[in-house]
Design a protein with these regions (language model features):
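Catalytic cores of alpha/beta
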Residues: 184, 190-196, 205, 216, ...
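Active-site-adjacent beta-strand/loop module that shapes the phosphate/pyrophosphate-binding cleft
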Residues: 74-99
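N-terminal active-site wall of soluble small-molecule enzyme domains
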Residues: 145-217, 223-225
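A short coil-to-beta-strand element that immediately follows conserved catalytic motifs
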Residues: 63-73, 90
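Glycine-rich phosphate-binding active-site loops on the catalytic face of alpha/beta enzymes
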Residues: 235-244, 264-290
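Conserved Nudix-box catalytic region and its N-terminal flanking loop in Nudix hydrolases
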Residues: 20-60
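Conserved N-terminal beta-strand and adjoining loop/helix that marks the start
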Residues: 1-21
Length: 290
């Protein structure tokens, strides 16, 4: 293994029926003891990622994975002299057996929105963001039509809605957010009183009420724009051009942020279609739809 060859690690983000996520505290005697992380460990050379996930979770917390899907891949280097680590995190939605601490670690269930307050390892911070983000983004031209989404909110997965302005009835946004949905506006001038929006290079999607933790995203068309977005402090990326060269997508994937790719609009350099819905589906290194 060379100095630049990453150490391949698998991790499992277990989500219970209430939407809480299981985290584990590193025990005394291990590096970074006391910090919290997602259960998992190193993949063996002969294993597939899923096989490694099954083995690690059985060894660490005594469960058998019944249903899981890729959530995000994160590259991290703990120090300039340390080899990089590739964390392949899976969303574990069903399992068999009772969860137990088999490695001397403390375990606890944590609400998704409380994860930023947990003393999570720096390497796992992008996983926290991916867990807070919904699997799908949808472009809606009529903000008031979001009210039609409320009656079915309990029967579908969380989603994020991209609108040109906030709905006139503020209760629409509130009820969607109570379900776990996110609402983003394209025009910062259309934000409600008490909210703040910002535009960096490219189009920036944000609705951040004072004191809230709404995640901010940015539309990017190249690897260079993705790096600039990371420097601007965004939380996720939207990639509208599905015809980007593989090398550009590789740069975007390597930025360490969750990202979404356009699977509905025609290929091309346009930022966002002027009308109609736009669906975003996570790439293998980002949030994915089951």
């Amino acid at each position: 293994m060379t100095h630049d060859t990453p150490i391949y690690v698998v991790a499992g983000a277990l989500v219970d029926g209430r939407g809480r996520v299981l985290i584990a505290q590193r025990p005394e005697g291990k590096a970074l003891a006391g910090r919290w992380e997602f259960p998992g460990g190193k993949k063996l050379a002969h294993e597939t990622p899923r096989d490694a996930l099954n083995r690690e979770l059985l060894e660490e917390i005594g469960i058998q994975v019944a249903r899981a899907r890729p959530l995000i891949e994160v590259r991290h280097r703990y120090s300039p002299d340390a080899p990089p680590v590739l964390i392949d995190c899976w969303l574990v939605e069903q399992w068999r057996g009772e969860i137990a601490s088999l490695d001397g670690q403390a375990l606890r269930w944590c609400e998704r929105e409380a994860l930023p307050d947990a003393d999570i390892l720096e390497a796992d911070r992008a996983i926290v963001t991916a867990l807070r983000l919904p699997p799908t983004f949808v472009r809606v031209d009529d903000p008031d039509s979001l009210e039609q989404r409320i009656p079915t909110a309990r029967g579908r997965e969380r989603a994020a809605w991209i609108v040109p302005a906030m709905p006139r009835d503020p209760s629409i946004t509130r009820r969607l957010r109570d379900h776990g949905d996110h609402v983003y506006v394209l025009d910062p001038q259309a934000l409600p009183e008490g909210a703040s929006g910002r535009i960096h290079s490219g189009r920036h999607l944000e609705w951040r009420v004072a004191g809230s933790r709404e995640l901010a995203g940015q539309v990017v068309h190249s690897g260079a724009q993705a790096h600039a977005a990371v420097a601007d402090g965004v939380d996720f990326l939207l990639v509208p051009d599905r015809a980007l060269p593989d090398e550009e997508m590789a740069v975007i994937a390597g930025c360490g942020l969750p990202y979404y790719v356009n699977v509905a609009a025609p290929a091309g350099p346009e930022a966002l279609p002027a009308t109609g819905k736009l669906w975003w589906k996570g790439a293998p290194q980002g949030p994915v739809v089951a």
